[in-house]
Each structure stands twice: as structure tokens, then as C-alpha cells.
A protein has these predicted regions:
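A general structural signal for stabilizing positions within well-ordered secondary structure
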Residues: 18, 35-36, 91, 95
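Short glycine/serine/threonine-rich phosphate/pyrophosphate-binding segments
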Residues: 24-28, 107-112
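Glycine-rich phosphate-binding loop and adjoining beta1-alpha1-beta2 segment
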Residues: 37-80
Length: 118
């Protein structure tokens, strides 16, 4: 039986966090999952801010491709009610990430608020 890798940082782990699942984020997450071995990525994490019923299939598809769902702590239960199983909350995902790719319109604002602290 193959041992499951942890999502938390280690000396040799490489975790990529993609923020946003829109026009840019969704295909990027899929591409990173497809090229994980070639790019030496251990985990592709993706953050989804809002649980939307019409995006359940999109989130499930990304998880099926091997991506790890990350949500805000205050939305965790809302995602679970929709049938999702988030594996991390945003605070832990940011600390585990070696690379953060923000695909949201608020990316520049997030840089000042979140990423400069990293």
C-alpha cells in the first residue's frame, strides 16, 4: 500500500497553492495536477472562497484530478454541507505553500494583506 504524503511542509516537499477557480485558476489547477511529476510538485492546493451550488461539479472535478481543496475557516461547514471535504483551511495552506499563485481580481490586494507576511 502506498503511503499518502502529508500536505505540511517538509525539507523536500513542494506545495503549490492556487487562489481562485475562475477563468485562469481552474485550468491552471488542472494543468498543475497533470504535470505534478514533471514539475516535482507534491501537492496542488486550491482555495475556493465561496461555496456555490452551481460550482459543485467544478470543485469535484479538480479534487478528482488530485488537487486539495482549501477553504476559509469560517466557510468550512458551508462547504461540508454541499458535500465537499476540504482538507485544509487557508491559514494552514499558506504556511504549507512553497509557491502561491493568485488568480483572483483581488490578487494585488491579497499580496499586501496576505503574501508579504510569508
Amino acid at each position: 500500500m502506498r503511503r499518502r504524503k502529508t500536505i505540511f511542509p517538509g525539507p523536500n516537499s513542494k506545495n503549490v497553492l492556487v487562489i481562485g477557480t475562475g477563468t485562469i485558476g481552474e485550468p491552471l489547477i488542472g494543468l498543475l495536477c497533470k504535470l505534478k511529476k514533471d514539475l516535482l510538485i507534491d501537492n496542488v492546493l486550491f482555495h475556493k472562497r465561496t461555496p456555490l451550488d452551481y460550482e459543485v461539479a467544478k470543485v469535484n472535478s479538480l479534487v478528482d484530478k488530485g488537487a486539495v481543496l482549501v477553504v476559509d475557516e469560517d466557510r468550512l461547514e458551508d462547504f461540508k454541507k454541499m458535500g465537499h471535504s476540504p482538507r485544509l483551511v487557508m491559514k494552514k495552506a499558506l504556511s504549507a505553500a512553497d509557491v502561491v499563485i493568485d488568480c483572483t481580481p483581488a490578487g494585488n490586494d491579497n499580496k499586501a494583506k496576505l503574501y508579504n507576511k510569508m
